[in-house]
Design a protein with these regions (language model features):
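Accessory interaction regions appended to the cores of large information-processing enzymes
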Residues: 1-127
Length: 127
């Protein structure tokens, strides 16, 4: 099983950030998707969870402005059915269903909550 790419920020996802992140796994969202801290935005190519910032934008220089964005080709996001989403999640993750979308998220939205959950799970396995 692969790990999750977890958003560390809340806001609209940027093309530049997603373009950089797609090298590290497959994305579940497209640019301008509203994301929140703790939301799973993709699947990591490795089997560890990764905290990522999908809001990071390119630093614009005076002359080269946003015209270069056309060169950033994004792989279309992987859209999941409810069944696929339920199959994909681990014990520490939830599927969030609204009339418009199916989203994945961590139970603990903040990094320290996720670390605490992981520590408790490891200590349970040791007992």
């Amino acid at each position: 099983a692969n790990g999750a790419m977890i958003s560390t920020e809340t806001g609209g996802a940027m093309t530049y950030a997603l373009w950089n992140l797609q090298e590290r796994g497959s994305l579940f969202i497209s640019p301008q998707t509203e994301v929140y801290e703790g939301m799973i935005i993709g699947e990591s190519a490795r089997n560890v969870d990764m905290d990522v910032n999908p809001l990071k934008n390119k630093k614009l220089t005076a002359i080269r402005s946003s015209g270069n964005d056309e060169a950033m080709r994004l792989t279309p996001p992987r859209e999941m059915t409810l069944e696929e989403a339920l199959e994909w999640i681990n014990d520490d993750e939830l599927v969030e269903i609204t009339p418009d979308s199916i989203r994945l998220r961590k139970k603990g939205l903040k990094p320290h909550e996720r670390r605490q959950y992981y520590r408790e799970r490891v200590s349970d396995e040791v007992k």
